[in-house]
Amino acid sequence: NAGHNPLLVYKAKEIRVEEENVKGTAIGFLEGYKYKLGKIVLNEGDVLLYYTDGITEAENANKELFGIERLKRVLLENSYKSAQSIKEEILKEVDNFREGYEQVDDITLLVVKI
């Protein structure tokens, strides 16, 4: 994951969300850094979710963070939908969680449905 948040993988056959957490430095941070390659076996209906920390670190007025567990729950609850709909549901849930509190970090999502 090149120093970014863990990749979330919804496994349709097991009906669960896994965190693919690989250690490493951010892309471009260290010249000549050798990244490890990994392999994930995917099946029809599985979903890959790449996201920036603007999602998990989104705050509400009580200074609570949206967090990875909420993100995993939203992915699980919407896994039967299209990639576009999953993205929209995540953004809606983050917005509802913030309750109008300012979003100070960027949000980037990439949803891939197999």
Give the location of each predicted region:
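Conserved subregion of the PPM/PP2C metallophosphatase catalytic domain
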Residues: N1-I114
